[in-house]
């Protein structure tokens, strides 16, 4: 079961005719190609990588990347429409926010011309799948505590370390890896590298690089999440992304976009939850009357619908600011933490109205409940977001 709600419910300044066309195309893509494979993706712990190629053929990848690098030449508004439709369709298997938005914009912002020409067209086509590896077993929200090392060699660097909870980790061909190039410094000693693992021998990853098994998660089970291991993995000198030891500043800058991406999903998820619950409560009879006729049900849904509407106004403001180049780190942090909190709360309240059926994965609301919980954790835990906001007060 998927929602028929078009995204977004309220017309926004960023929802131009061409962006609306992207939303319609994305809705067709998820309905026809992705959702029918949801069960197989959940069993395998990863989606079929051919879906990335399919999205590329339909022009749905890297839409905010310039056309000269294989992208669509659009703005973040096009990406937001696409990601909204993904959430409304109920898909969490394709981590397209990472592959088609986050990683390409790191390369666009900090990459050399050679790096842009080598990687961006193949990411846009879906031929290569991308990931970004920041988190480590002992360094989650505190990225400055990472211990992965990139030691200089005669022709580049030798990379060693473990990265965990990496979205697209199993399917990735290209990984942006954060590692210490100055072990005596914290954030000032972090550099970013474009690590190319496309060269495989007999189906195996290159020497010095390996992947763990798909992580068993409580939600988003079809989404590819894995550990990555580097052991004296050779990285050429021209793989440095941006300035040496400038990686932490680059991460802080780009994380604002990532947090808005999570906000986009949070709002669409709330809208979907409300719609599914209204539909269910109007069909479900209790005490010889529709559940929707009960005052408690109506009040609960009225409050949830209001929260979803206010959240839509907030995320529309963030999307417009990002499109115009005016989004600030503090507002992005506010959006990430508050919208994630509201998403989890609204889905929980909606699930309650399903009664015991809400605890069954046969009903989408149960899967939404499990899928939503990570929103408070990744891209910076909500507690960290509050600290970032407090520093500006």
Tell what function each PLM region has.
Residues 1-89, 93, 110-115, 122-127, ...:
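Alpha-helical interface subdomain recognition
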Residues 74-76, 142-144, 168-173, 186-189, ...:
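Short glycine/proline-enriched turns and hinge-like loops at secondary-structure junctions
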Residues 96-98, 123, 138-141, 165-168, ...:
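Short Gly/Pro-enriched turn/cap motifs at secondary-structure boundaries
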Residues 126-134:
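A short, Trp-centered hydrophobic/proline-enriched beta-strand micro-motif
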Residues 145, 201-232:
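Flexible, small-/acidic-enriched active-site or ligand-binding loops
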Residues 148-150:
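A structural signal for short hydrophobic beta-strand segments in well-ordered beta-sheet cores
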Residues 160-210:
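A short core secondary-structure module
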Residues 231-249:
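Long, acidic (Asp/Glu-rich), low-complexity accessory segments flanking structured domains
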